[in-house]
């Protein structure tokens, strides 16, 4: 399912006393404390209904889309920059949202999707596709923010690797790691040869298909 727009309702809590105690009280009311910052404006402490936020968090696209926060009737265009979850139960405990300004570049981590895994010659030869990243930090203006980056691995042979610089980027998008002075063009996926265990397993299967000779069978019966 593709979502083109996310909108959440929020309440301004800036006039209230802030702190751990206040956050606990909000959570007891099924509200998630959060903050909006950036864009040259003052931070705003807010709260969001937990069921609204949880519903949006079900979609991967929520983490790489421009979001609309409706705070007491005033709309704020934001991206989510941090989300704290309960360590055991996983529900959201606090969220940080950064304002986006039209034409002003933002840094975002977007998901990476790998396609063509089954079609890859390396996979068909028994190789193992090892993916080393789940997301990549990019820089772009808000209107050019991609939902995800797709990496086509359908042509990978055993021993092949794919680096950051090999990614075909949408227009206006750059990779943060490659835009730094000490650019690190790291590997993000490689096709490894079959493991020793897998090779041995194949050998065992092949051996089990070979019938025992009469001589070997007689020897076992006689105990010789």
Swiss-Prot record:
Annotated GO MF terms: 5S rRNA binding; structural constituent of ribosome
CDD domains registered for this protein in UniProt: Ribosomal_L25_TL5_CTC
Disulfide bonds: none
One of the GO BP terms on file: translation
An example Gene Ontology CC term for this record: cytosolic large ribosomal subunit
Role noted for this protein: This is one of the proteins that binds to the 5S RNA in the ribosome where it forms part of the central protuberance.
Protein family per UniProt: Belongs to the bacterial ribosomal protein bL25 family. CTC subfamily.
Protein name per its UniProtKB record: Large ribosomal subunit protein bL25
Annotated organism of origin: Psychrobacter arcticus (strain DSM 17307 / VKM B-2377 / 273-4)
């Amino acid at each position: 399912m593709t979502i083109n727009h996310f909108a959440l309702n929020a309440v301004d809590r800036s006039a209230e006393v802030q702190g751990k105690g206040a956050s606990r009280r909000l959570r007891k009311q099924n509200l998630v404390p959060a903050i909006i910052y950036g864009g040259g404006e003052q931070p705003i402490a807010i709260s969001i209904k937990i069921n609204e936020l949880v519903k949006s968090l079900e979609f991967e696209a929520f983490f790489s889309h421009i979001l609309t926060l409706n705070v007491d009737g005033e709309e704020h265009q934001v991206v989510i920059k941090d989300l704290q979850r309960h360590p055991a139960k996983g529900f959201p405990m606090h969220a940080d949202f950064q304002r986006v300004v039209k034409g002003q570049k933002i840094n975002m981590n977007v998901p990476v999707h790998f396609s063509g895994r089954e079609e890859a010659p390396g996979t068909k030869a028994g190789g193992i596709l090892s993916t080393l990243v789940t997301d990549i930090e990019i820089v772009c203006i808000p209107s050019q923010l991609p939902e995800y980056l797709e990496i086509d691995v359908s042509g990978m042979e055993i021993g092949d690797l794919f680096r950051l610089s090999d990614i075909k980027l949408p227009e206006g998008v750059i990779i943060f790691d490659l835009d730094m002075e000490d650019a690190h063009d790291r590997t993000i996926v490689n096709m490894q040869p079959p493991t020793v265990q897998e090779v041995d397993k194949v050998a065992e299967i092949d051996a089990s298909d070979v019938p025992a000779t009469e001589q070997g069978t007689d020897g076992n019966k006689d105990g010789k």
